[in-house]
């Protein structure tokens, strides 16, 4: 910014990440960053839990993934709060549709549950006005959850697709009605392990010199 202020042009400034391309080089991103606010209403029992234009969060969690569903699920788990991660349980749809009309701390989870329990994307959009693109991404997560729960066995392809959608071993175990250690052992036997990707601005086209990585 300082160099630009004194007259440098973008093509004269070095990209700090690659050290080999100019700042004018069009960035290409192969990752998604999701930030989720963290609330602490349990510490303030008399506070109004409805979300308004007033800031009520006490912090946030950030996650990086290769896709929006992966980054979203990782961010929710990073809140380290009971009820933050998605669950796939049978609930009363009418009650859920009533709840999602009021923006609260757990509205996102209620929207996910409503979609899982039979609500359509259009129906949820009319109540919440959440952009259908985001609702469709949540629906895809639910579809993957159903596939995990109802498949005969955990194949390498199924586990790989589940991980690409951001499912943890614990979530897969809950859907399969087994334990986390067993899922981890199956995954290990199938040679499926986390890898670490570099955060850069060129989608791996050039070597990045910044020590900034995320697991995927």
Task: Give names to the regions the model predicted.
Residues 1-216:
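ATP-dependent carboxylate/acyl-activation modules
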């Amino acid at each position: 910014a300082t160099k630009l202020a004194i007259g440098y042009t973008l093509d004269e400034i070095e990209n700090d990440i690659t050290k080999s391309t100019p700042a004018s080089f069009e960035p290409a991103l192969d990752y998604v960053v999701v930030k989720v606010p963290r609330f602490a209403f349990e510490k303030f029992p008399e506070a109004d839990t409805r979300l308004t234009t007033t800031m009520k969060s006490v912090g946030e969690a950030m996650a990086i993934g290769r896709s929006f569903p992966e980054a979203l699920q990782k961010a929710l788990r990073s809140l380290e709060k009971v009820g933050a991660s998605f669950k796939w349980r049978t609930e009363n749809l009418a009650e859920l549709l009533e709840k999602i009309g009021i923006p609260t701390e757990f509205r996102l989870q209620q929207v996910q549950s409503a979609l899982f329990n039979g609500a359509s994307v259009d129906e949820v959009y009319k109540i919440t006005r959440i952009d259908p693109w985001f609702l469709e991404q949540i629906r895809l997560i639910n579809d993957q959850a159903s596939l995990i729960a109802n498949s005969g066995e955990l194949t390498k392809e199924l586990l790989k697709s589940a991980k690409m959608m951001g499912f943890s071993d614990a979530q897969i175990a809950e859907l399969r009605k087994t334990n986390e250690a067993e899922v981890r052992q199956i995954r290990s036997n199938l040679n499926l392990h986390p890898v670490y990707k570099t955060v850069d601005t060129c989608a791996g086209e050039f070597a990045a010199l910044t020590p900034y990585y995320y697991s995927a």
